Regions:
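C-terminal domain-tail junction helix/linker
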Residues: 69, 78, 102-165
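Active-site beta-loop-alpha junctions of metal-dependent nucleic acid enzymes
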Residues: 31-53
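Mobile genetic element proteins and their domesticated derivatives, centered on retroelements
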Residues: 4, 20, 26, 45, ...
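Short amphipathic alpha-helical segments
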Residues: 71-73
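Short small-residue beta-strand/loop micro-motif enriched in glycine and branched aliphatics
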Residues: 27-31, 83-85, 109-110
Length: 165
């Protein structure tokens, strides 16, 4: 699982969106925050864990402060491997960077007002978009099927998942 962050700045207000994508299935998750810290990194990871359709065994991040202290300690307690990208090598993050671009083009650019002035509504809309992204939006790299359908088809998941019916 590759985890990254996006930030936006407007009218003296800074907002952050943490993002994560699975290299194999393309499963994508994101959440917006008003500040960036290792506590928000931990909160994001716990939210990711609660919705991820499989057990996360390893994560890859940059050296951002959001991936230190509380985030790092939690991963250690859970026995999850934590790999770091080389500094100033965004190509190590290619898949999450591409997913971030899709997020910006298909969702973020149309919801900037909520990101800055109503973060709760922004995150509610973001969750709706992520459901679409993971269950309905075709992905060329997955044979033009969405990530959760790919998981069901290729990884032996039960077809009783709500997204499959």
């Amino acid at each position: 699982m590759n985890i990254d962050s996006i930030f936006r700045f407007k009218d003296g207000i800074k907002r952050y969106i943490l993002t994560a994508i699975d290299y194999n299935s393309g499963f994508f998750f994101a959440y917006g925050y008003s500040h960036l810290s290792s506590k928000s990194g931990l909160d994001f990871y716990q939210k990711l864990e609660s919705v991820c359709p499989f057990k996360i065994k390893a994560v890859q991040t940059d050296h951002g402060l959001e991936f230190e202290k509380y985030f790092r300690d939690y991963l250690e307690r859970k026995g999850i491997l934590h790999f770091f990208n080389y500094p100033k090598h965004p190509q190590m993050n290619a898949q999450v960077e591409r997913a971030n671009r899709t997020l910006k083009e298909e969702f973020l650019d149309y919801n900037l007002s909520d990101l800055f002035y109503n973060l709760d509504r922004f995150n509610q809309k973001l969750m709706d978009w992520l459901v679409f992204y993971n269950t309905k939006r075709p992905h060329y790299s997955l044979g033009n099927i969405p990530p959760l359908k790919y998981l069901i088809k290729n990884l032996g998941f039960s077809t009783m998942l709500w997204t499959y019916t």
